[in-house]
Structure formats: structure tokens, C-alpha cells
Amino acid sequence: MENMIRPEAVVLADNALIPPANLISPPPNQFTHELTVGQPYYYAGAPQDRPPDGTFAAGTKVVLLVYNGGRYCRVADRQGLYVETEYRGLQQL
């Protein structure tokens, strides 16, 4: 097309990809908890002196899938993202 300006193509770094083990398909459509505050999440377990893999916004609805009474739990959001985050930031719906 004439007069169309296209942005320069950019290749994302490998860490921009979500590991297949951290995606649930189909994603959940019913939720058990909501995050009361914005908080980080991790793909491969609790942090070991490394930055978080992402952050949930306050109000994000999730399904609580694994909780063994400790500081962290495993949840899935509406996009099927299966991650570990702090349990204390969750509120039951």
C-alpha cells in the first residue's frame, strides 16, 4: 500500500516467552480468589534472589490451585497463566 509506514521489526528476547509449563489450556473461566494488592509472580517457584517474571494488578481474579500453608501458592489467571505468588495477597471470592 502506498504511504503506509511500517514499524521496524523487533525480535523479542527469550525471556519474553511464557514457558509452556506455565500455560493452562483452556484457561479457567471460574475463579476462587482475587488479588487485594498488586504483587509479583514467578514461573519457577519462590524467588531465589531473582526478579519476578511479572506482576498481577490488584483486582486480578485467579483460581487457587496449590496451597500448602506456606508463604507462596500456585494460581491461574483468566489467560491460563499458571504461576507462584504470595498467598497473603489473595482474598476468597
Regions found by a protein language model. Give the residues of each.
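Structured surface patches comprising rigid loops and adjacent beta-strands/short helices at the edges
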Residues: Y87-L93
